[in-house]
Amino acid sequence: MLSSQSPSIYTVSRLNQSVRLLLEQEMGQVWISGEISNFTQPSSGHWYFTLKDDNAQVRCAMFRNSNRRVTFRPQHGQQVLVRANITLYEPRGDYQIIVESMQPAGEGLLQQKYEQLKAKLSAEGLFDQQFKKPLPSPAHCVGVITSKTGAALHDILHVLKRRDPSLPVIIYPTAVQGDDAPGQIVRAIELANARHECDVLIVGRGGGSLEDLWSFNDERVARAIFASQIPVVSAVGHETDVTIADFVSDMRAPTPSAAAEVVSRNQQELLRQMQNGQQRLEMAMDYFLANRTRRFTQLHHRLQQQHPQLRLERQQTVLERLRQRMNFALDNQLKRVVSHQQRMTQRLNQQNPQPKIYRTQTRIQQLEYRLAENLRARLSTTRERFGNAVTHLEAVSPLSTLARGYSVTTATDGKVLKQTKQVKAGDLMTTRLADGWVESEVKGITPAKKTRKKKPV
């Protein structure tokens, strides 16, 4: 039996779980550089590969929701920099890392340093807005810290010459690329502050790769810009290039040319502003003089209006106007009375019954005439229709047929005889003629011979 002093006994599951927790809690998230091998991507979309160097290797997994953010396709033998969590796959006891992000090793290392320095300086408050110094407006002298042979200096001088040719420019030439560049940039910033020759500084260079721009991601340069008593405008690379110097400077310009635009005044614009100001001043003076002239004219007119003769004339004018209004009112009143009288007379005439009686009699006569005409027309139409009916009836009447020499013979039972086979010898029959009836007895029957119909040829 085991004694009470025996060490704790782990099951395999508990051991793997404890090791996993220890790895995840103690190691946390780390950056790892290595070479990719055995890269696979099953249908799940996850990536599985081995990360190795000359002496060791480790299994890696990068799940689909993480690898979809990778901007390149990992290749066998490629050097990469990954950010990952250390863990243990408990069922098999395999030690592995779970990759969260992946970058190519060259720029990836620089990017990591960039992010670390950015976080450090931000935590110290070097990027805070409260420390940003305002740019002079207008600037009386501009200092430029850049390479004396680079395109950035040419662009800056070209813009300054175009916008403000009289603005003094002091160039502090430095290297902007290489191991010595950060130190030279720092010394140039310190020199400009020591001389007090200019009231704004442009620090920058033209575009390039991350390595080319790395001098402006140097901590020494960032702290020198922050410590500068002269406001600093950063102008590094193109608009898409963002460096530590951009965050710590008092203002970031997307390009060197834009920085020159920021620190200079457009003399042509100033000339237009002066011309506009002069025009506004002339307009204000014209308005002032016109206003004073109008006021003088008003006072002069009022003075003339106070003359006694003018007042008397105005009173006479008012009196004449009142007289005209009174005559007009009397005429209108008289017209209204006459008009009212005419309307009353017209209404009275309209109430007289004689015109109504006359109109009613006339209406009755018209109706009587129309009634008589309608009766005559209807009687004529009825007579015509009756005559047509009689003519039609006579045309189809059997009596008319009898009058033409035909007759109708009937048996004793009243049936009309049409064929000889309906009677026999000794039968009585009655014949209807046009003017009466004849009764006779059948003595003999002789059928008529049938005529043959000719066949068509």
Curated annotation (Swiss-Prot):
GO annotation terms (biological process): DNA catabolic process
Chief place where the protein resides: cytoplasm
Enzyme class: hydrolase
Stored CDD domains: ExoVII_LU_OBF
GO cellular component: cytoplasm; exodeoxyribonuclease VII complex
Keywords of this entry: Cytoplasm, Exonuclease, Hydrolase, Nuclease
GO molecular function, one term: exodeoxyribonuclease VII activity
Localization (cell): Cytoplasm
InterPro entries documented for this protein: Exonuc_VII_L (IPR003753), Exonuc_VII_lsu_C (IPR020579), OB-fold_nuc-bd_dom (IPR025824)
Assigned EC number: 3.1.11.6
Annotated TM spans: none
A Pfam family reported for this protein in Swiss-Prot or TrEMBL: Exonuc_VII_L
Reaction equation(s) it catalyzes: Exonucleolytic cleavage in either 5'- to 3'- or 3'- to 5'-direction to yield nucleoside 5'-phosphates
Family per record: Belongs to the XseA family.
Record's subunit section: Heterooligomer composed of large and small subunits.
Reported function: Bidirectionally degrades single-stranded DNA into large acid-insoluble oligonucleotides, which are then degraded further into small acid-soluble oligonucleotides.
The protein's name in its UniProt record: Exodeoxyribonuclease 7 large subunit
